[in-house]
């Protein structure tokens, strides 16, 4: 079973983050059941809104999301980083253009189906 652990931020941000991550797992990686995703909602000092890093194997991931983002941008950023999770989990090349292309589509689908 996939595990998602979220720390930092406010309770409503953690709840939103969990919901978006579980939604994107269903959309992007429906067959995987052994993902371990650790998310930290934190202040990111540069112009980036989020980061995704692979852990010890291609099933363990660390994501940082800027907690200062508004909800719309937070959902977009989470969707973007989850595309990178998909790329790493499937041993695909991490292509930024794919993440940028899929993030608005995933975010819109999330808002329409989950809210």
Set out the residue ranges of the language-model regions:
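Catalytic zinc-binding patch centered on the HExxH motif and its immediate surroundings
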Residues: 40-62, 71
């Amino acid at each position: 079973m996939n595990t998602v652990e979220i720390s930092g931020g406010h309770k409503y941000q953690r709840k939103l983050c969990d919901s978006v991550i579980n939604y994107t797992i269903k959309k992007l990686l429906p067959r995987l059941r052994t993902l371990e995703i650790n998310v930290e909602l934190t202040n990111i000092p540069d112009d980036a809104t989020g980061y995704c890093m692979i852990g010890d194997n291609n099933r363990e991931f660390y994501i940082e999301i800027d907690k200062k983002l508004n909800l719309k941008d937070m959902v977009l950023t989470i969707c973007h980083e989850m595309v990178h999770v998909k790329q790493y989990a499937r041993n695909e090349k991490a292509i930024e253009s794919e993440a940028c292309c899929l993030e608005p589509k995933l975010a819109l689908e999330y808002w329409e189906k989950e809210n």
